[in-house]
């Protein structure tokens, strides 16, 4: 204690650098003496061995811990070897880039292929003068073989086409067939004799199953019995080789047919007969898949609209496909038809409401009714090139003209509404067979009837409308053959010349300038009260 006091007295007011003289300062502290710096820096060999063993133990422990961590990391999907993991990540990223590039290139390739298909379709339509209106319209056919490659058509159908003489599809067939096969509804307007019948028959025969006992699968409506019979014959020829039940709705079948037990795949009929069978005989049309209105403009004329509406309602299948085919498609008819159709495609070949450019058309001024008879006899004397169709405006005038030609040693026949079905069919068959040279007819035969090789059509009486004119002259110039159409007109017909002249102009025929200068008429139809044709004395 005294030493401490003495030390305090000696060193009072003096400052020591404790850091600098740490060793010396420690000597004056109480407790065990601290080791000097030299001894701390140089430990004994024994301590060195202990420290080394502890360090080794720590390192081994650390390695074991790292091994455990890396093992757990491997379980979670990470590589133990960082270099390999980095390389793998690079490879994966490169693969992703390559996959992305390949996907992008595939999208580009598909887009280019679609663009090429659209371009090919546009070129084909332009080549064949096909005009379409609608969304996502299928590409037209290049040939009939595409029906097999694109749509899986049975070979027997293509074989039947070849046997029937069909080598290449006509323009309306190129576009209308793919539309119907794609499940779309359509309006089809094409010149007479352009193959419209085949355009709707072929998809039906491809899509429905033959020999079905589930009821009627397809209904085809025609404005006349003759056209319905002709369509039935063509359908049976095309379906040869398969057991399709194809029925023509005759008068007897309509009135007394047993429709519950009747096997029928395709039913072809006129509107009135079919409506009678539905209303009076309980004909079931609820499973009809295809409804075709052939010569639709005539079917929608006044008097048929209610009947057509009744038939459409009877065909109540929600997935039914409806289509309209005609040589003319007036705007009023199209507007009316669209009320019963959904997402329909409009197809027009050539110009709307025009005649075939293969028909040579002439207008001849005859002055009076007697002048027309003289002009007709003169035409026969100069160049009678049978078979010839002559159109008049009434059955009375048909009978009168037939009597006149009977005295001229011309092998003529007549067809009109007063004849029964068998007589009318005989008259048509005789012209087809060449037994008669001239067939005198009313409008009843102007719709859709196909006479092989009709060379000339003569409009003895001026047609009532441009539409009637197109259908009349369309009996010639069919299936790619040339034809001739002669139209007589009198003073009474002059006011109506302009409407017919427009058809001639659109078909590329020459029309005198004075006819072009005539005023347009708002009336679409007319019927002139004409003097009798006959120059013979009345029979008492």
Curated annotation (Swiss-Prot):
ATP binds at residues 190-197. GO terms for biological process: maturation of SSU-rRNA. InterPro entries: DDX52/Rok1_DEADc, DEAD/DEAH_box_helicase_dom, DEAD_box_RNA_helicase, Helicase_ATP-bd, Helicase_C-like, P-loop_NTPase, RNA_helicase_DEAD_Q_motif. Keywords: ATP-binding, Coiled coil, Helicase, Hydrolase, Nucleotide-binding, RNA-binding. Residues 24-73 are annotated as: Disordered. The keyword ATP-binding applies. Residues 47-64 have a biased composition (Basic residues). Residues 101-129 form a coiled coil. It comes from the Eukaryota. CDD domains: DEADc_DDX52, SF2_C_DEAD. GO terms for molecular function: ATP binding; ATP hydrolysis activity; RNA binding; RNA helicase activity. The keyword Coiled coil applies. Belongs to the DEAD box helicase family. DDX52/ROK1 subfamily. The Q motif is unique to and characteristic of the DEAD box family of RNA helicases and controls ATP binding and hydrolysis. This is DEAD-box ATP-dependent RNA helicase 57. It comes from Oryza sativa subsp. japonica (Rice). The lineage of its organism: Eukaryota, Viridiplantae, Streptophyta, Embryophyta, Tracheophyta.
């Amino acid at each position: 204690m005294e030493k401490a006091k003495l030390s305090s007295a000696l060193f009072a007011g003096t400052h020591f650098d404790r850091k600098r003289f740490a060793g010396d300062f420690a000597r004056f502290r109480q407790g065990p003496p601290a080791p000097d710096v030299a001894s701390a820096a140089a430990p004994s060999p024994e301590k060195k061995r202990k420290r080394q063993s502890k360090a080794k133990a720590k390192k081994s422990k650390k390695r074991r811990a790292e091994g455990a961590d890396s093992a757990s990391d491997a379980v979670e999907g990470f590589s133990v070897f960082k270099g390999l993991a980095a390389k793998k990540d690079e490879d994966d990223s490169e693969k992703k880039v390559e996959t992305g590039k390949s996907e992008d290139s595939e999208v580009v390739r598909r887009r280019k292929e679609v663009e090429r298909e659209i371009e090919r379709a546009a070129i084909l339509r332009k080549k064949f003068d096909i005009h379409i209106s609608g969304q996502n319209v299928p590409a037209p056919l290049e040939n009939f073989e595409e029906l097999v490659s694109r749509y899986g058509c049975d070979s027997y159908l293509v074989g039947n086409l070849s046997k029937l003489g069909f080598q290449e599809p006509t323009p309306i067939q190129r576009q209308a067939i793919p539309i119907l096969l794609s499940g779309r509804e359509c309006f089809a307007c094409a010149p007479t004799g352009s193959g419209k019948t085949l355009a709707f028959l072929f998809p039906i025969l491809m899509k429905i199953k033959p020999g079905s006992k589930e009821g009627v699968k397809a209904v085809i409506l025609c404005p006349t019995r003759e056209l319905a019979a002709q369509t039935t014959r063509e359908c049976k020829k095309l379906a040869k080789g398969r057991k399709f039940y194809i029925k023509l709705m005759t008068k007897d079948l309509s009135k007394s047919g047993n429709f519950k037990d009747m096997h029928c795949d395709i039913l072809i009929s006129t509107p009135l007969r079919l409506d009678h069978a539905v209303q009076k005989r309980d004909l079931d049309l609820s499973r009809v898949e295809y409804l075709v209105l052939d010569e639709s403009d005539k079917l929608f004329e006044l008097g048929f609209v209610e009947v057509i509406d009744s038939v459409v309602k009877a065909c109540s299948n929600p997935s039914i496909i409806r289509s309209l085919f005609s040589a003319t498609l007036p705007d009023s008819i199209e507007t009316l038809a669209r009320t019963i159709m959904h997402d329909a495609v409009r197809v027009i070949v050539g110009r709307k409401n025009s005649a075939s450019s293969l028909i040579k058309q002439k207008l001849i001024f005859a002055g009076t009714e007697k002048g027309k008879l003289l002009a007709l006899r003169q035409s026969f004397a100069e160049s009678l090139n049978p078979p010839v169709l002559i159109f008049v405006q009434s059955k009375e005038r048909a009978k009168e003209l037939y009597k006149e030609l009977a005295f001229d040693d011309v092998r003529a026949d007549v067809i009109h509404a007063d004849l029964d079905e068998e007589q009318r069919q005989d008259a048509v068959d005789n012209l087809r067979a060449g037994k008669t040279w001239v067939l005198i007819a009313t409008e009843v035969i102007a719709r859709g009837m196909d006479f092989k090789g009709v060379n000339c059509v003569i409009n003895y009486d001026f047609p009532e409308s441009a539409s009637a004119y197109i259908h009349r002259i369309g009996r010639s110039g069919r299936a790619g053959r040339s034809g001739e159409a002669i139209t007589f007109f009198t003073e009474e017909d002059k006011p109506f010349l302009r409407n017919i002249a427009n058809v001639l102009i659109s078909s590329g025929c020459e029309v005198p300038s004075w006819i072009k200068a005539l005023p347009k008429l708002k009336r679409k139809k007319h019927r002139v009260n004409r003097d009798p044709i006959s120059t013979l004395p009345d029979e008492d």
